[in-house]
Amino acid sequence: MKEKKTKRRVWRGVATTGTSLLALSLSASMVIDTFRTDIDKFLGTQSTQMVTDNQTEDDYTYKSDYSSTTELLDSIEDLGERMSEEGTVLLKNNGALPLSADEKKKVTFLGFSSYFPIQGGDFGSSLVENKGTDADTVDMVQAFEAKGYSLNPTVQQMYEGMKEDFKSEAVLPWGVVTYYRATAPAVGGTFTSLEPSQEKLDKAEPTWKDSMNDYNVMIVTIARAAGENANYTPGEEGVNPEQNLNQADPLGLSDTERATIDAAVKAKAENGGKVIVLLNNASAMEIDELKNNDGIDAMLEVGIPGGYGFYGVADVLSGDANPSGHLADTYAVDNSASPAAQNYGDYEWTNADSDYSINSEIVEAESIYAGYKYYETRYVDTVLGQGNASDSVGSSTGGAWTYNSEVS
């Protein structure tokens, strides 16, 4: 009996030890495999080897077209500049452009977006800055100065001193991101204009209007951001009601933006200068009042230029490049009058679960007739006298629908 008990204890000990070693081995294997790369680096070993048939030395060698990193960065900068030159659209020019060499030396930037422009999307296609490289990304001020423009220092210091007033937030799926520029409202939200009032500007710098006598080429930038998870609700519903800025649509002008343009037009009447409007946006704006404003000498759509595109904008204004771009969207007189705007909104499900970030939908009932397809098709129908196309439904004037009254 004693011998049997001894054997049992031995086997139990062996089994326990074996089980422990097996568990330790499995755990160690998983740990080693997880940190295999670091262990190989430390020991100077190699865990894997890739073997292919007919392998040659250059099979997996990428051959660059550039001889150095500097040359690569210069090429990226050049591409960004040329894209902006070729994509800029000249919407209006009453003999104001191109600017002469003398006019380049007396430029006033107006509008906070001249100093804090939109260069990328709020979420996706956002600006990736290069700093401390051979091709640093530049904003509008830096680009124009690099191209030989002289800017009104009084107005520049005024706007840059108000930087904190231009802080805005973009609501992204993982949280809120802060920008110092215009941002688009979240889906279902309202647009808030950050353009400062004339009273605020006068308080910040009482002499800013007088300073334009010496810098009488006035460039006003109007901006609207864009991005994923952000949209503009058409009509007054999409505008912050607390501001009371006589803004009929988030993509239309606010009274503070109108006042900035009016200040430039008034200064021009006194100093004999020029007024140029730049549209810095990725969403088609309501620009009819800008087009019809005789005080505005030129207007350009510059889009969202990225890290180097403002070099190209500066070249377009001076005539060193031609604005060969064409609009990719229809610029409607009234965005809210189009069929696509009728079903737009943030319509949540009745049984929405707050734990999920997507609880809404939009019913697209207009089929393919969105944007230019709607306007061009309805125009043809008015010419042919069919489909009740001349009816007042969808007319921004309240009268018979006409193409020229609906498209800027």
Name each model-derived stretch.
Residues 1-408:
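C-terminal non-catalytic regions of proteins with extracellular/luminal or membrane-system context
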